[in-house]
């Protein structure tokens, strides 16, 4: 469709909005050339999904539940799920969202958002599941996850965050599953971690690449701080890795950091 702008407003009973489709359907490339999207006064909307190649030419996305902002005004007070299917918003360069107080699930598909340079998740009090597909967010230099009190699952697919230099995983008290695929974060130079109570971390799956990068950072002169909250207190904060510090960590968390 050649439409350059799309506005959906004043639909009080709309609960699910799916624009485009996944790879198994025929109506892909929806609003491929659309550069402006307006979603206003959709008070009942709970699920927002963008399909394959949807909004391919859009360069900025602002999801703010209580504000009209930029070229993507959004008023979605009850939104609980956001999904970007494969290759949707592939030209996106700027991503901002806030006030999404009910969102529990965010899914970013394969090859999405490869031009975005910064990504932050810090205003999602109900977020429980955050997943990234393969080959996505490859140009993100700074990745921040902060103050996500309900986040339980983080999943990152192969070859994603290829150019990421700095990461913050801070104040994530209930994370229980942390999965990192192959060749993820190969460029990391600084990691700041505080992934919650160790007893809650029941499943940690990381690739050899990520383990190697973490080990190199720990043993180099880079400014590296690993924070770990255990029994309600900070267990350790060290500039460089040491065998003693490694042994002091609970087993599940050790596997997240070293081969």
Describe each PLM feature range.
Residues 6, 17, 37-40, 48, ...:
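Conserved hydrophobic beta-strand positions in leucine-rich repeat
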Residues 219-233, 237-257:
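Low-complexity basic/metal-binding stretches
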């Amino acid at each position: 469709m050649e439409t350059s702008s799309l506005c959906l407003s004043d639909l009080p009973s709309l609960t699910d909005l799916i624009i485009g489709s996944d790879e198994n359907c025929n109506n892909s490339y929806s609003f491929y050339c659309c550069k402006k999207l307006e979603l206003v006064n959709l008070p009942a909307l709970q699920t927002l999904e963008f399909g394959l190649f949807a909004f391919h030419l859009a360069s900025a996305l602002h999801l703010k539940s209580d504000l009209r902002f930029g070229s993507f005004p959004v008023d979605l007070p009850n939104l609980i799920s956001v999904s970007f299917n494969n290759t949707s918003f592939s030209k996106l360069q700027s991503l901002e969202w806030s006030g999404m107080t009910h969102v529990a699930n965010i899914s970013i598909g394969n090859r999405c958002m490869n031009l975005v340079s910064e990504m932050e998740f810090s205003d999602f009090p109900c977020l429980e599941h955050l997943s990234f597909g393969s080959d996505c967010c490859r140009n993100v230099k700074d990745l921040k996850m902060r103050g996500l009190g309900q986040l339980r699952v983080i999943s990152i697919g192969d070859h994603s965050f290829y150019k990421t230099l700095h990461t913050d995983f801070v104040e994530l008290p209930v994370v229980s599953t942390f999965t990192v695929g192959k060749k993820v974060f190969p460029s990391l130079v600084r990691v700041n971690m505080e992934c919650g109570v160790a007893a809650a971390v029941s499943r940690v799956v990381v690739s050899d690449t990520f383990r190697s990068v973490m080990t190199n950072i720990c043993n180099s002169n880079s400014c590296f701080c690993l924070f770990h909250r255990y029994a309600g207190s900070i267990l350790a904060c060290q500039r460089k890795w040491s065998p003693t510090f490694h042994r002091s960590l609970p087993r599940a968390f050790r596997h997240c950091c070293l081969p």
